[in-house]
C-alpha cells in the first residue's frame, strides 16, 4: 500500500499513462505478496491443526484457511479492478470526446463501487480468518497467547469499523486493514520460526 498510486483532479493523457503504469506495477507486487502470504497461511494452518489433542485436525484452523481462501478470491478481484481495469478505463476516457465525460464518470463510479464491494469482502473475511486462527491458538496453542489475543481484538475491531462505515476502504483505509493484519501474520510467523528452531535444537540434543 505504501507505493499505491493516487490520482486526483484532472489528468492529462500523459499523466493517465503514468498512473496506469504505476498502478499496474503496484498491484502486481500486491498480488505476488499476497500469494506468498497465502502460502504462509497454509503452513500456519497445518501447524495449528496439528496442535489439537484429538485424532482429527482442529476445525477452527481448517475453517480459517477456508475463509481466507474466500478472502483471497475477493482480493484478487479487487486488485485486478483497481490495478488494471480502472486505469485502462481512465486511459480510454482521456482519449475520448470531452462531451462523453459524464458517461465515463458514471462507468468509473460503477467500477469503483465494484472494487469497494470486493475490498470489503476481503477485509472482513480475512479478519474472520485471523479471528478463527487466533481462537484455535488460544484453545490448543501453537501461537503465543499475546499474539492470539491481538488477533482476536484486531479482527473484531476492523470488522466492526467496516460494518458501521467508520473505516472507508480507500487507499488509507486499506492501509490500516493491511497493516493491522500484517502485524498479526508477521508476529505469528516469527513465533512459528522460533518454535521450529527450538524443536530442531531439541532433536539435535537428544
Q: What are the language-model segments listed below?
A:
Residues 1-206:
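Hydrophobic, aromatic-enriched alpha-helical segments typical of multi-pass transmembrane helices
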Amino acid at each position: 500500500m505504501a507505493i499505491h498510486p493516487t490520482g486526483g483532479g484532472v489528468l492529462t493523457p500523459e499523466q493517465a499513462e503514468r498512473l496506469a503504469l504505476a498502478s499496474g506495477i503496484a498491484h502486481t507486487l500486491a498480488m505476488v505478496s499476497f500469494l506468498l502470504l497465502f502460502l504462509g497461511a497454509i503452513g500456519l494452518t497445518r501447524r495449528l491443526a496439528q496442535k489439537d489433542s484429538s485424532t482429527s485436525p482442529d476445525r477452527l484452523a481448517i475453517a480459517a484457511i477456508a475463509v481466507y481462501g474466500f478472502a483471497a478470491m475477493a482480493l484478487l478481484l479487487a486488485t485486478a479492478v483497481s490495478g488494471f481495469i480502472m486505469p485502462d478505463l481512465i486511459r480510454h476516457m482521456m482519449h475520448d470526446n470531452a462531451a462523453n465525460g459524464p458517461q465515463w464518470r458514471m462507468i468509473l463510479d460503477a467500477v469503483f463501487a465494484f472494487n469497494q464491494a470486493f475490498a470489503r469482502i476481503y477485509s472482513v473475511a480475512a479478519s474472520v480468518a485471523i479471528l478463527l486462527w487466533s481462537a484455535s491458538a488460544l484453545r490448543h496453542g501453537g501461537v503465543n497467547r499475546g499474539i492470539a489475543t491481538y488477533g482476536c481484538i484486531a479482527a473484531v475491531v476492523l470488522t466492526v469499523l467496516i460494518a458501521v462505515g467508520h473505516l472507508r476502504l480507500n487507499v488509507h483505509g486499506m492501509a490500516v486493514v493491511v497493516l493491522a493484519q500484517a502485524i498479526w501474520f508477521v508476529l505469528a510467523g516469527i513465533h512459528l520460526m522460533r518454535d521450529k528452531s527450538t524443536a530442531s535444537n531439541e532433536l539435535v540434543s537428544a
